Amino acid sequence: MANVVVVGAQWGDEGKGKIVDWLSERADVIARFQGGHNAGHTLVIDGEVYKLHALPSGVVRGGKLSVIGNGVVLDPWHLVKEIATIRDQGVEITPETLMIAENTPLILPFHGELDRARENQNSVAKIGTTGRGIGPAYEDKVGRRVIRVADLADAATLELRVDRALVHHNALRSGLGLDPIDRDALLVSLREIAPQILPFAAPVWKVLNEKRKAGKRILFEGAQGALLDIDFGTYPFVTSSNVIAGQAATGVGIGPGAIDYVLGIVKAYTTRVGEGPFPTELDDADGERLGTRGHEFGTTTGRKRRCGWFDAALLRQTCATSGINGIALTKLDVLDGFETLKICVGYDLDGTRLDYLPTAADQQARCTPIYEEMPGWSESTEGARSWADLPANAIKYVRRVEELIDCPVAMVSTSPEREDTILVTDPFAD
C-alpha cells in the first residue's frame, strides 16, 4: 500500500487542508509531522466549515486514526479548546481516533510571551511571527529543556523539567525586561491540563510502524510551506522547523523507506503572509484582484496575504528539496477573467540570469523576476471536475506550469468544495 506525504510547496496557505481531506478517504491514518498551531487549515464539508490549527485534518473523517507526531510543538490549552470546538460541530474525538506522540514538545505560556516580546523589540528586522510561541518551543527542544507530553504523567519529573526550563527563561526574561515566571502557577496549570492530554498520549512511532506492516495507508500532513523551511526557506523569514517532505519520517518516527509518494500543494498564483522576500509580489490592481478573488486572509491571524504571479523558478527548487512526485494545483478559478497571466521563469541578479533564488538574503532582495506571458481566459473554471470542463487556455496554463517546474500535475482544485477536484493521478495508487 502506498503512503503519501503532503507538503505545501510555496509559503503556506496553498490549500493543503482541502487536499488532505480529499485524500483522507483513501487513507487509514492521517499523521501531522511538524509545526504548531500557527498554521491553519480551513475545510468545507457538506457546507460545514471547520477551522483547524493543531488537529490533523483527518479528524473530521469518521473511522480514521489521526496522529500528532513528535515533530509538532503542541500548545495543550489550545488543543483542548480546539477539540471542544470541533466536538461542538458534531465530530467525535476520542483516544481511539486521535493519538499524540508521547515525545511531543509542549508550548507553554512563557514561549508565547517571549515570542511577542522579541518581535515587538526587533523594530529593525521583524520576522513576522504569529507570536504563538512556536519558535521558542523549538529552541527549547533543541536546547534539551522542553517539557514533553510524557512529562505530564509524573509530578516529580514535571517539576524537574520546569525548574530546568526556568533557569534559562528567567535569565532571558530579565534581559528583555519581563517579570520572572511564576513557577507554582505554571505547575498548577500543567497539572490541571494533564488529565485532558494524557489519554491521547501514545508511542506513535510504534503504532505507525505496526500500521504500516499491516498494510494500512498512511497520509503524512505537513503545515505551512517548503519556502518557510528552517534550512531551505527564505531565511531568516522562515518557520522554526523543517517543512520539506524529509521531515515526515523524523516527525513521526518512521523510516524514510515508508514514503512512497510526495504530493506538493501549489496555488495557481503565489501568496505570502508576513515579512520576507517575494520576487513576484504585485502592489497593483492585479495583486488586489488576486487577494479579493482568492479571499487571501490568514486562517490563524486574519492577516492580509501578499499576492503575486506564479513563480516557477521557486517551485523547481521545492520540487527538488522535497522530492515531489506530483503537484496539486489549487485555486485555478481565481485566475478566471485575467486577460493576461504571467509566470516567473527565472531572475535577474545584477545583470546575470538565474534559474533559482539564491540563498543570501541581500541577493534575494536584488532579484527581479523574469516573466513569461500567457493568454488568460474569460470562462469560469469554478467547480470544474474534469479536463473537459476547463477552457483551452486554462489547460495550456496548467501544462506550461508542468513543463516549467519539471513535475506533473496530479490534481487540480477549482473551488473550496472537496468534490470540485480534477484527479489526474491518484497518489495512493499502488
UniProtKB/Swiss-Prot annotation:
Keywords: Cytoplasm, GTP-binding, Ligase, Magnesium, Metal-binding, Nucleotide-binding, Purine biosynthesis. It is found in: Cytoplasm. This is Adenylosuccinate synthetase. SMART domains: Adenylsucc_synt. The gene is purA. Pathway: Purine metabolism; AMP biosynthesis via de novo pathway; AMP from IMP: step 1/2. GO terms for biological process: 'de novo' AMP biosynthetic process; IMP metabolic process. Gene3D superfamilies: Adenylosuccinate Synthetase, subunit A, domain 1 (3.40.440.10), Adenylosuccinate Synthetase, subunit A, domain 2 (1.10.300.10), Adenylosuccinate Synthetase, subunit A, domain 3 (3.90.170.10). Belongs to the adenylosuccinate synthetase family. It catalyses: IMP + L-aspartate + GTP = N(6)-(1,2-dicarboxyethyl)-AMP + GDP + phosphate + 2 H(+). IMP binds at residues 13-16, 38-41, 130, 144, 224, 239, 303. The active site is at residues 13, 41. The keyword Cytoplasm applies. GTP binds at residues 12-18, 40-42, 305, 331-333, 413-415. Substrate binds at residues 299-305. NCBIfam families: PRK01117.1, purA. Its main location: cytoplasm. Binds 1 Mg(2+) ion per subunit. Transmembrane segments: none annotated. One of its GO terms (cellular component) is cytoplasm. Homodimer. GO terms for molecular function: adenylosuccinate synthase activity; GTP binding; magnesium ion binding. Its EC number is 6.3.4.4. SUPFAM superfamilies: P-loop containing nucleoside triphosphate hydrolases (SSF52540). Plays an important role in the de novo pathway of purine nucleotide biosynthesis. Catalyzes the first committed step in the biosynthesis of AMP from IMP. Its cofactor is Mg(2+).
